[in-house]
Amino acid sequence: LPPLDEAYLEETLLQLLAIPSPVGLTDAVVRYVAGRLDGLGIPYVITRRGAIRATLRGQERHPARAIVAHLDTLGAMVRELKDNGRVGVVPIGTWSSRFAEGGRLTLFTDTQQIRGTCLPLKTSGHAFGDAIDTQPSSWDHVEVRLDHPLASEADLQAAGVRVGDWMAFDPQPELQPGGYINARYLDDKAAVAVLLTACKALRDSGAELPVDAHPLFTITEEVGSGSSAALHGDIAEMVSLDIAIAAPGQATDERAVTICLQDQSGPFDYHLSHKLIGLAQSFGIEHRRDVFRFYRSDSAAAVEAGNDIRTALIGFGADASHAQERTHLDSLRALGRLSVAYLMSAPVARRDSRNLPNSASVAVSRLRTLGCPGRTVSEHPQYSRNLPFGGS
């Protein structure tokens, strides 16, 4: 396989983490990734919603494939201007207020940025004693203290703070000499850095791809819509790159790539998933198989939007997802190598390049079949022919 530029990987990850990108405030990170693609000479388009669809030309146009990572992160938004000069908070995405408490952040007004800290309603042990340990932990029990002379709602208004202002928490990245990486928002900026590095490896090596591949960078994965508007009907198979969950009861390892066989939306495509397992085995890539019960990704968004595609999920192993996340460079290397191997491999099924009738015409055909006296669905030619099994 073409080698990965690990210096590029680390540099890209740190630069991505330095750009605030909570869902809805992603223009800056989109511009950054577009610049990275420009530097690699990879053409792309930006959708109306702001996602990036790049193109790596292959020897054949069809069946085209996509490989996707998301640029958006968790965050928060102002929901209330309080009489004490602080602001109430609502989360962007799904995460616990436990991991917001004590976090430094930037609040984005319409005209300026204000630094601040997210704190429980009762913070000082000198003032509240044991009450700081018995207060509930929820978004209703935290507030943001802004580093500005503010003592009332009127002061907040005068400073330009409004309900609906975005807040981005500091990522606090730390790369250890032993390879461990700690930061908020490794989900999914670590995978974005890996995907860009994989693209660089392919460009630097001049490797020929068998079919067109479209690296996708989505901007609303954390709120569920993700890749739903980034596919154009020409994609036959899509692999999502995302965080994999290292926790008790899970098989994921922080130093390997995970191939997920099922998440809360159901099983991923059997043939595509097992192709990825086979590639990992063939190239000696350290990997784990896992299932995630409380998890969804861009793959689910694509299928729910009505796309007729095969989907799979591979990820970097990370501890404490949606909190103070930690992964290891070994896992990012493994994810990168598997991504390159996948992009250089043949399609899962050549028959996926055929244009199939749209869902409406199939539905009409099925209804007509069911309405024919003396003829069952199983007797209709459309349903009785033997379909190939596997990737044939």
What are these regions (language model features)?
Residues L1-S392:
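N-terminal hydrophobic/helix-forming segments and targeting peptides
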